[in-house]
């Protein structure tokens, strides 16, 4: 069983910060121009309402974004990488010393890189995963992994070695 990644906390945090930013910006603009206590009170209440809406929206955002599904894949082979892989950016926190080549894709730290969505470049010192976003994730070269990728049922790699 392999667990695929979800959007996770990124969307939730972004939604809450957007609401907080809007509320604080509203206060910063409205209060200096307020002519009475009622206008100041209205600005503070509007900001409070924005924050409340942001906090109430988190469960709904979770329902929409946390579509993590557990997939069952057939493992073709496993490769132990000498140096632990560490990805940054969108895949921050992925660290792995084992890579699984499966029927549906490449599995690194429980994250499934599907064959249809990625391309590989096999170079002499590293294997590069090319994601649809254009991002490149380098993996230290392993003859065993390169051979498994060549034998897998995919034509999504470029062998430059």
Curated annotation (Swiss-Prot):
Keywords: Cell membrane, Membrane, Transmembrane, Transmembrane helix
Topology class, membrane: Multi-pass membrane protein
GO cellular component labels: plasma membrane
Transmembrane among keywords: yes
Spans through the membrane: 13-35, 40-62
Compartment list: Cell membrane
Protein name, per record: Uncharacterized protein AF_2160
Organism: Archaeoglobus fulgidus (strain ATCC 49558 / DSM 4304 / JCM 9628 / NBRC 100126 / VC-16)
Organism phylogeny: Archaea, Methanobacteriati, Methanobacteriota, Archaeoglobi, Archaeoglobales
């Amino acid at each position: 069983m392999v667990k695929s990644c979800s959007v996770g906390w990124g969307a939730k945090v972004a939604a809450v910060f957007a609401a907080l930013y809007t509320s604080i910006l509203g206060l910063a603009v409205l209060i200096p121009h307020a002519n009475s206590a009622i206008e100041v009170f209205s600005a503070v209440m509007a900001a409070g309402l924005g924050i409340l809406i942001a906090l109430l929206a988190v469960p709904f955002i979770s329902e929409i974004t946390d579509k993590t599904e557990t997939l069952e894949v057939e493992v073709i082979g496993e490769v132990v990488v000498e140096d632990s892989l560490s990805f940054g950016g969108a895949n921050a926190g992925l660290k792995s010393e084992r890579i699984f080549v499966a029927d549906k894709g490449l599995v690194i730290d429980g994250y499934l890189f599907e064959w249809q969505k990625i391309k590989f470049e096999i170079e002499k010192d590293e294997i590069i995963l090319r994601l649809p976003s254009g991002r490149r994730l380098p993996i230290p070269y392993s003859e065993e992994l390169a051979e498994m990728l060549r034998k897998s049922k995919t034509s999504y790699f470029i062998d430059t070695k």
